[in-house]
Amino acid sequence: MKLLNNMNKDRFIKFQSSVENTWIKRMTWNGLYNNESWVTINVAKFLKEAKPFEGTMFSNINDFWKFINKIKIDYVKWCKDIEDLDDKEVEALQKFFIGCIGEYFFVTLFKEHNTLVINNKLYRFDYVCPRLDDEKDYGVDLTGVVSNSTENKSNECALQVKFWNPFNKDFQMTYDILSRVFTDAILNDFIDKNENENIFVCWLNDDKNISKALRHSPIWDYIIFIGKKELNDNINGKFPEFWNILIENLNNI
């Protein structure tokens, strides 16, 4: 356990030493076909040039998400001025944009408000960072160390970010999605497979919108959701202050 925790700390230190370059790379669209690198189609570059957040202020997570869902259209229009895109690429780019903002949102959240009450338990998140450049992506988006004060123990943790539409019931968390995350986390030594409660899913959808197969699967006991309720309970009162920090950081990537 100590070895794995140290590994997460070392990964976080490595991330901190190249935080700007890491985010620029993660926010660069690699193309839907042939894995070509389209450096010009970059979320960070769009935010600097279009300045969609200029003059904005939100007091809760729902209003923030509605705005993100709105400006994804502006992002695609901006991309179309640079590259010719077909319908599949447009849809993929919208999801890519929301995913980038979602990952950045949660990394910033765990840096500024690293203690959250989830299911009446107090958790502290440390060393949370995105995947490093040399790590293949099979499902885990963020990693870190989580401490459960109720049980007085610290575990390495894996987090998947699904920054999904809280107002759209069509998105469902399934066994296939979470089983890939669980397998990826274990095979890459992001978590200790013998410890419970070390896979977190960060999403904004309804907690009832989960497949029956997932609820009855063996991995269900390993999963903790950080969703609308948890975010509303923990940060809504501090959201204006958090929003200023988030936007300042995004504008300086």
Where would I find each of the regions flagged by the language model?
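Mixed-charge (Asp/Glu-Lys/Arg
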Residues: 1-253
